[in-house]
Amino acid sequence: MSRGLGDVYKRQVVNNKLKDADRVTIVTLGGTGHEPAISGFVGEGMVDISVAGNVFAAPGPQACIEAIKMADKGHGVLFVVLNHAGDMLTGNLTMKQVKKLGLNVIKVVTQEDIANAPRSNADDRRGLVGCVPLYKIAGAAAAAGKSLEEVAAVAQKFADNMATIA
């Protein structure tokens, strides 16, 4: 394990203040290769755990399940997934398993890239840099003591109304 602003485990970067978290926590996932995304956004008021895959590849669901279990401090976990095929597959499989485990998790998907598809066809839009302000907004709501449902609602409203172009 490496220490700094975040602790680094095999494929997880963990906010080193997570152990003291008395709030909703935020977990995200993504492939490596575009640093500082996604692991570079771990820190106070942002992401609590980032799960990294190989270069340009999503991590497996088991790593995400372990991260969610580690992040869960009794207030629930917001699971942010960017709309890319591998990330979505991992995100959906992860959600299926954490629900079976009885964990309180809500998934929010970023799919804001308007270069791919119009708003009416959001499922075909990629999640890109819009995740960064979403992490900050959700992190601020969590830090303010909002419930998981409230944090997720704020994050979802932002996700539904943002657009980027790449």
List where the protein language model places each region.
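Short, acidic/small-residue loops that bind anionic groups at enzyme active sites
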Residues: 50-55, 99-124, 130
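Short glycine-rich or small-residue beta-strand-to-loop segments that form or flank ligand, phosphate
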Residues: 24-31, 47-50, 76-85, 92-95, ...
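Glycine-rich oxoanion-binding loops at beta->alpha junctions
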Residues: 34, 38-74
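Gly-rich Lys/Arg/Thr-decorated short loops/hinges at beta-loop-alpha junctions or inter-strand turns
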Residues: 20-29, 38-51, 115-118
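Short acidic, glycine/serine/threonine-rich loops at helix termini
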Residues: 37-41, 89-94, 117-124, 163
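Single conserved hydrophobic/aromatic residue that forms the stacking wall/gate
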Residues: 1-5, 9
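Internal, active-site/partner-interface "lid" segment
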Residues: 116-126, 133-166
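A structural-propensity feature for long, helix-poor, extended segments
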Residues: 58-83, 89, 117-136
